[in-house]
């Protein structure tokens, strides 16, 4: 009968490095990126938005005509080899106007969301961290602004400032400030009593340093998600203001304005309405897909 001998224990040498699979720290941002890559809808949305960004950048290379160039002899011509998306009631090439309109829509989305993000995040940080009467004052202002439908408040602001694309951009930024503000405020309130914040205060760290070095970095996930979703909302609101004649003015190729100018030809020349409307739908859908994917990746608790 064979006797089994116990295998000797392998003790690591004092200076030997730990195994490769031990103490492996995975960055939460890297893990979120991995989850995002697995989300097929988010990838589709990213492809859509990237396509429109490239179209906006290389607009002069995609078409040789001007978006304001008129040709009455080509009035309301259907899609053809010469005019891919047809022409409008002034004989202007709709494809050219769609391409240059992508620039306007993306610029409005970027600047409106950036403005709302900066002011909303700042106010949310102040209200959530300091609390007391400062929080009460800022929160009441947010509540009053959110009591009105965003598009109605934007219309009122543009009516005061005057109809133009710049004023529409300002109005869209203003109506989105409380959305970012309340989001950041709620996140700050949940963080300010955490142990690492209390430890920073105990070490004598100044409030500004605590806010920007500890609280803000830990609040980035919901801010990024809201900013992505806000892009689509801002573009849709700009199109609505343009449709009402309060946004971009002729001859600027803003998609909402194109819809407004062509609504009387919806039966006789449906292409004049179809392509601008389809462009708005695609861009908004693309940003919503990316936003939903980011939300699921950065905050799995919110996954429905």
Swiss-Prot record:
Name the UniProt key words of this record, in alphabetical order.
Answer: Cell membrane, Membrane, Peptide transport, Protein transport, Transmembrane, Transmembrane helix, Transport
Q: Which PROSITE patterns does the record match to this protein?
A: ABC_TM1
Give the residue ranges for region: Disordered. 1-24
User: Which GO biological process entries does UniProt record here?
Assistant: peptide transport; protein transport; transmembrane transport
Q: A GO CC term? A: plasma membrane
Q: Name the NCBIfam families on file.
A: Opp2C
Query: What name appears for this protein in its UniProt entry?
Result: Dipeptide transport system permease protein DppC
Matching CDD domains: TM_PBP2
Q: Which InterPro entries match?
A: ABC_transport_permease (IPR053385), BP-dependent_transpt_permease (IPR050366), MetI-like (IPR000515), MetI-like_sf (IPR035906), OppC_N (IPR025966)
Family to which this protein belongs: Belongs to the binding-protein-dependent transport system permease family. OppBC subfamily.
Q: What role is this protein assigned?
A: Probably part of the ABC transporter Dpp involved in dipeptide transport. Responsible for the translocation of the substrate across the membrane.
Q: Extract the PANTHER family matched here.
A: D,D-DIPEPTIDE TRANSPORT SYSTEM PERMEASE PROTEIN DDPC-RELATED (PTHR43386:SF1), OLIGOPEPTIDE TRANSPORT SYSTEM PERMEASE PROTEIN APPC (PTHR43386)
Q: Which residues form the ABC transmembrane type-1 domain?
A: 102-291
Organism of derivation: Alkalihalophilus pseudofirmus (strain ATCC BAA-2126 / JCM 17055 / OF4)
């Amino acid at each position: 009968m064979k006797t089994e001998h116990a295998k000797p224990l392998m003790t690591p040498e004092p200076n030997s490095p730990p195994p490769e699979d031990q103490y492996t720290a995975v960055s939460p941002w890297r893990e979120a990126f991995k989850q995002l890559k697995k989300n097929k809808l988010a990838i589709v949305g990213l492809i859509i938005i990237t396509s429109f960004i490239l179209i906006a950048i290389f607009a002069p290379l995609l078409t040789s005509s001007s978006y304001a160039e008129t040709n009455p002899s080509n009035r309301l011509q259907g899609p053809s080899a010469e005019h891919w998306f047809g022409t409008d009631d002034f004989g202007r090439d709709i494809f050219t106007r769609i391409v240059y309109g992508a620039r306007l829509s993306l610029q409005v989305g970027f600047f409106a969301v950036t403005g709302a993000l900066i002011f909303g995040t700042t106010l949310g940080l102040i209200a959530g961290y300091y609390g007391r009467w400062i929080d009460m004052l800022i929160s009441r202002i947010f509540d009053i602004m959110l009591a009105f439908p965003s598009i109605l408040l934007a219309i009122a602001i543009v009516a005061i400032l005057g109809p133009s694309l710049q004023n529409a951009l300002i109005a869209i930024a203003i109506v989105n400030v409380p959305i970012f503000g309340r989001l950041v405020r709620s996140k700050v309130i949940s963080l300010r009593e955490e142990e690492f914040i209390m430890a920073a205060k105990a070490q004598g760290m100044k409030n500004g340093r605590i806010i920007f070095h500890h609280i803000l970095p830990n609040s980035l996930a919901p801010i990024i998600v809201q900013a992505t979703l806000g892009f689509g909302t801002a573009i849709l609101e700009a199109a609505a203001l343009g449709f009402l004649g309060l946004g971009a003015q002729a001859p600027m190729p803003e998609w909402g304005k194109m819809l407004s100018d062509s609504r009387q030809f919806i039966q006789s020349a449906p292409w004049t309405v179809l392509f601008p409307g389809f462009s708005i739908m695609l861009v908004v859908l693309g940003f919503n897909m990316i936003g939903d994917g980011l939300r699921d990746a950065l905050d799995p608790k919110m996954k429905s």
